Amino acid sequence: PETNLGIVRIGTDGTTAELLWGFKDGGKFTSEFPTHMMSHISRLEVDKKHRIVMHTHPTYTIAMNTVCPLDEKDFTHKLWQSNTEAVIVFPDGVGILPCMICGTNEIGIETAEKMKKFRLVVWTNHGIYGTGATMDEAFGLIETVEKTAQIYMLTLGKAVNIIPDDIIRGLAELWNLKPLDGVLK
């Protein structure tokens, strides 16, 4: 992992970066590094604690966005209906971008714009970005989406016993969370 992964600290002046770990033996930054930086800027404007930006390529999340409409509220609702943990972990929902050319400034700008509203942004047919105050928080967000997408895909959206909206609403109330407006019926 030290060749293909890296941990970078951005200087307090915002113009310098320091490699703390990784990219050994000729490893280099991903082509999506500019997207990471733009996402950092957007999330830090929303929450100063969100200093972690993580990008992964989770199989079931990618599979789910190939069979579901690219509608953020519908996609979020399907996740919330599949796992009671989902609304608790990401009550703000999941942002979605259409299929775009990765590694470009265009997708970076679009991702950064979504990051102003969402902590999670799915890149259709590619992967997901998650943010948080810690590595555990960012990974936990992504892992919860992936686990829930796996449940959805294993049932191919034909589950009979989905979680009703009143239960999702009750979970949100119990945990003092505000679900993304317009998702619950």
Region spans (language model):
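Glycine-rich flexible loops
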Residues: P1-K185
